Amino acid sequence: MKIRLYASLLALLLVFPAACAFAQTAVTANPNHQQLLQGSDARTTANKRLVYDFWRIVFEAGHTEYAPMYMAEDYIQHNPTVANGRDAFLQFLTAFVKPQPIKPRVQLPLVAILAEGDYVTLVSVRTLPDPKDATKTYTTTWFDMFRIQNDKIQEHWDAATK
């Protein structure tokens, strides 16, 4: 009897961690954008604000007339679906974002805004369809990283694929 109990407990202990390995804690946004915009010094704070306002005004609201305030003309793009250069980015953007009122906050569900030196990374929630069940979704993270040079966005990376 004891052997069977120990065998059952051992089997449970072996199966339970494996099942937990496939469990996921949902990724959630941080609602406090003012906290996210705080930097360790004046430079990182300014760089965070530059990227945040670019995202809010140009990317989300589609106000491309403000792009020269935020983006270098020779902007470098590492997303494989968008060409280099500010003009190429704007051509890409205007194909799917039409100008709309500028909101006071970024609408992207931000998890974090990280800044180190000339680099700023937006970390956000990404909700995707569950490949095993089309009626469900799951959350994961997405990132957009920017390099700032001369107070403008000079370069961008993300996880996009072709």
Residue ranges, per PLM feature:
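Bacterial N-terminal signal peptides
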Residues: 8-18
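A solvent-exposed, acidic/Ser-Thr-rich amphipathic alpha-helical stretch
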Residues: 64-69, 73-116, 135
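A short hydrophobic beta-strand element
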Residues: 51, 89, 115-126
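Short, surface-exposed coil-to-beta transition loops
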Residues: 106-109, 123, 137-143
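A short, structured loop/turn motif at beta-sheet edges
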Residues: 113-120, 147-153
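Short beta-strand edge/turn micro-motifs at domain boundaries
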Residues: 139-162
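Bacterial N-terminal signal peptides that target proteins for export
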Residues: 1-9
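Short, low-complexity N-terminal intrinsically disordered segments enriched in polar/charged residues
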Residues: 22-65, 69
